[in-house]
A protein has these predicted regions:
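A binding-site-centric feature that preferentially detects glycan-recognition modules on secreted/surface proteins
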Residues: 1-105, 109-175
Length: 175
């Protein structure tokens, strides 16, 4: 996995900001379980890559950079609460549970918008993002996509799922 990440890092220098590859290697060596998360991201079609550094915490950010929402992470409702409430035709799982199992988080709206400054993602798909508690408490959830050169944020019932909607993950590595 380290070789794949190194190659992707070298091929997409516009994504990394001020993060040097040596910093990524040191951070991964100090947190070896992160390689398991990166492997899961890669195996489900995420194509993880370094997208910079958190300006507050200094953490190195590694995010799914596949052009479309990862194929093996689609047709999922938002969370397990929505999954339990869906009686007819339930999906095979939920985005939040899958992310937790992989050791990553869904992107926030701000993180998703930042990702879109690094390239054009989700031109034919959409991705669940973290829903604020005030929306989730009413049964809703949020997803994003890029169309017409713009990033859009939409709402839907948390129990909804579509073959074109998945989720993107982000992994934070202490620097």
């Amino acid at each position: 996995m380290l070789d794949i990440l190194r190659e992707r890092f070298a091929s997409n220098s516009n994504r990394h900001g001020d993060v040097a590859w040596e910093e990524v290697e040191v951070a991964l060596a100090q947190q070896p379980v992160a390689l398991d998360s990166l492997t899961a991201m890669e195996e489900t079609g995420g194509e993880p890559d370094v997208i910079g550094r958190d300006q507050i915490t200094g953490e190195i950010l590694i995010c799914d950079c596949a052009r479309e929402s990862p194929a093996k992470r689609r047709s999922l409702c938002y969370d397990d609460e929505a999954l339990r409430k869906r009686k007819r035709n339930p999906p095979r799982g939920s985005a939040l549970a899958q992310a937790e199992q992989m050791g990553v988080s869904l992107l926030s709206e701000d993180e998703y918008r930042y990702l879109q400054t690094l390239g054009e993602f989700d031109l034919k798909s959409s991705s669940w993002i973290i829903a604020p508690s005030e929306i989730r408490s009413l049964g809703g959830a949020l997803f994003c996509e890029r169309r017409y050169g713009r990033t859009f944020v939409f709402h839907n019932g948390a129990d909804s799922y579509y073959s074109t909607r998945g989720w993107r993950g982000i992994l934070r590595l202490p620097a």
